[in-house]
């Protein structure tokens, strides 16, 4: 069952290939003592497994996958269906396309029952992908325990692994890694940390832990383990493909979790933002400046505290007296759309607080309605995004106060769930506590507790905006987007929404820039194509004297490098909280002309280059929409089969794989992530092409052979970029 009827989508049945082995069952139900396991063929080359102890599920449990999938065999399982039941005393075999499930006992028929998953190779042989981890003298690989008196339980599910396995995806963490092998990842959202239990393995399978609960992912040497802190059902999916065929794995994942719609054209241009434009006059002067300087801009953003009170979900009329006039003037001067920030928090002095409280539309604490956080001296509670009525209330305010006045794009900041996810200032006290993550497990929602459904909150918040968009434009889910949202968090299948995810409030230093590259590649492997960053980083690092200061040459260099890199991201966006020696507005500047006379032409040249890449961008976004094919592409996606060095480089998380990537099928991007650089080393993979020198350096047109590290000129005005094939084809978008 879906969490909301909004997710209902008829299956788009894809004609199976002649060699496709249709499922030999609609499902197998195993009764194993107090435990029940339901295994169903799911989509192409996949199985869905659900397990529970004692009490059966209701069938209405929260799920992030389509049932039936967007693509799959026509007569496969759905809901809780099955055609075979067993007590677990007999071995069973199910097949779905190129994946096989076998059930086997160990240590005798009373010791347990293990599931094993195999891929059918092109030559007909079978390869073990993984099985339930059950060495001698160990806990059951499906381990349940009850930490409290209620019906919800905790679960730990363990699967076998090998030392040479490589793990890609898992959402985003600030860790310099694209291979997550060896990681322990807590599934708790906070600023710049979006753990999401979707991964691909170099062994030729992908895995989705289809659960809204907080928990943990562990990728050990011999064991992969997933835990759920509080649940009534364990639900996961495994899909198979041939080794190295990551496009097929992404197609399978997106067929289960959702395909991205096509973005509106304006979102692919340059997005201007800072903390913060304080009032209508500043925004109109900004638009006039872009117009007078003849610099293209596609969206201008109004950041937080533009409201009178938290939860008003309206611009403060004292600062923004005529919103419709402002948005029209911005449009007339620049052609740009507008976006405004909103937070999910509601202060008790908000005009909306009484109505939200009276109708049960706010999150609450376990022991009563109490407050869940504070901000700048006000007690606050988040609206309950898991409640459909709360989502409708939020959109009604946004439509009346923004959308109908010309601001039709929304920045859903602080959407991590639980609370704001940060304790900046505790009820107005003088002590400043910076970005301390906490889960607030005492928070309750309509859908459950923070422990049991906490990972749902940001996803449902994205859904609130999507539902509003679709109702306002009378369009169906999956159709092209007219507008966009921008979220600091997400979860399984967030790509189905017209919603960007950005990497959060990062610090303005070189190492943080480097970390963002790896973070974006993990986002891509998770299935999120709509990803971006704050160019220049968001906040000052207090240990680095020049960090974020637009008047220092040290920060200007970092900003130019960072901004150049965003040209080759799914979305090109600048934002940040800057410092300066000379301040002529409410906050320090962050516009293209703010970084010195010598740097302005460089910044503007990259903005123009972004628009020159428009046809290419539309082409790669269209493929992501149609098939789930990744936009940002870690090198293993394209070159693992043709270049034997790639696997070794990825295994060690070498900079040549964490700091460079393919942007679509033709561009190799290697951003400079160190200061004072005049040349930069780049690893050019072997492509398998007959062309002995397939790589062309963008700035010099010099060609290079693959399979080697080359050092190329990289002055401040040039980000290292190579292309395959002709530049003319690339710029025309004729690349597939």
From Swiss-Prot:
Its EC number is 3.2.1.177. One of its GO terms (biological process) is carbohydrate metabolic process. It comes from the Eukaryota. The active site is at residues 413, 505. It catalyses: Hydrolysis of terminal, non-reducing alpha-D-xylose residues with release of alpha-D-xylose. InterPro entries: Gal_mutarotase_sf_dom, Glyco_hydro_31_C, Glyco_hydro_31_TIM, Glyco_hydro_b, Glycoside_hydrolase_SF, Glycosyl_Hydrolase_31. Optimum temperature is 55 degrees Celsius. Optimum pH is 3.0-4.0. Glycans are attached at residues 24, 279, 332, 376, 471, 655, 676, 690, 701. The keyword Phosphoprotein does not apply. One of its GO terms (molecular function) is carbohydrate binding. Its main location: secreted. Catalyzes the liberation of alpha-xylose from the non-reducing terminal glucose of xyloglucan oligosaccharides. This is Alpha-xylosidase A.
